[in-house]
Amino acid sequence: MIIRNFPKQTNSLLPFELNPNKFPSYYGYPMYGYTGSYRNIEFPISQNGNFLQATSGNPPGRRVPEPIYSSGVQRSTRINYLPSSQSCAPFQSHADCDKSPNSKGGESYDWNYGWSSCCSGFCPSKRECAKPDPKECDIGNDILDRDPLLKIEWDVNAPNYRCTYDLHKINTSEQINLFVGKNGKNKSYDEIMTSFCEIPSHICPIDPGDGSLNDDKRGKEMEKCSRLISLDDEGTRCRAWAATQDNKTIDNIKEEYCLHNPNSPDCRCINRSSNSLYDEAKKNNPFPDGCWYKPCSTSVYLKTSDILSDEKHCPKEMCQVIYNVNQNNDVVIKDNTNNIKCDFTKFIPPTPGPNPGPTPGPNPGPIIPPINPLPLPNPTFLENKNVLITGIAVTGVAVLLFLLLMFKSKTT
């Protein structure tokens, strides 16, 4: 659905897209019905298409902004006049310019920028006066076509002026550029950037997931994120500015953003105390969250400076200690492992299986009775046998010799 009844502006401000019930807050104010989207910023819109203006004041918990000032020396005489108390007539005294509010809470004479001749120079001249001109303060309207200027007044005395702006109506890069062109990068510029960088963006990096098994957003672009990590020009601007600020300032921006955007994926580390699994794992855990809690060790998510510092001092034995403390706590060891930056499987002993009984050996086949070897002859018997054989041999040789002798004697 596209809103088409929005007051006509430059073409770059249209169209606005309606997103029903998508985001819970606008700069910390409750939102109702629909939101209008322009340049990936959400604004409250009623269901009939009219923009809802933020109420005055700040709801509970919302940081009260410092006034935003711009000052300079007026050159415009656009809102000019001649004092009505002086007429062009002889012997008239010079009437003063009227008075306008000043920055001290009082009034100062308007700027007497020249003189107007009376009676062709024969009567006393009249002062030419100019009031503070709001055009001197013009930095353009905001995303909802609202003028952020609250008032212009003389800065003590004319022609010095001071402008006061509504911080929540300065929310475009174009406004900031015009402000810097008039004032440079002063304290008010830092206040503007603080508020500007707390606005959500929808041009976001890939969500690495928080480690949950049912995290269906993992690997997809975040639907919403802080401008401190967004991928648009506003994100680039915020990161460049943040690099010039102290840790406390940037920590406050991150915490303020996550306070009013609790469902923003990049707040999973900062809003970790709202996760019951984190609370369970934190019990008896002496280690810094930046070491063991996965959302706080993921580079894409918002992290405060203490978490960033913790990541540099993580003990090597951390996972073993966490396991030892929680080894009987299934909520930590089994249900919460996806949030803890540890592989507990290396510490969990293997579960013993059922007793398998004796392992059967190979089939031995048919049983063959053993063959008993013949008994070795008695050594004494062998010795006697050898003597007998020797005796028989000697006797045989003697018989042969006798027979030979007998045969020889007969032949002779």
Curated annotation (Swiss-Prot):
Q: What is this organism's lineage?
A: Viruses, Varidnaviria, Bamfordvirae, Nucleocytoviricota, Megaviricetes
GO CC annotation: what is one? virion membrane
Protein's cellular compartments: Virion membrane
Write the protein's name: Putative membrane protein 337L
Using the record, list the residue span of the signal peptide; answer none if the entry has no such feature. Answer: none
Q: Which key words are in the record? A: Glycoprotein, Membrane, Transmembrane, Transmembrane helix, Virion
Topologically, how does it sit relative to the membrane? Single-pass membrane protein
> Which stretches are transmembrane?
387-407
Tell me which family the UniProt entry assigns to this protein: Belongs to the IIV-6 337L family.
Sites where a glycan is attached: 171, 186, 247, 271
Q: Does Glycoprotein count among this protein's keywords?
A: yes
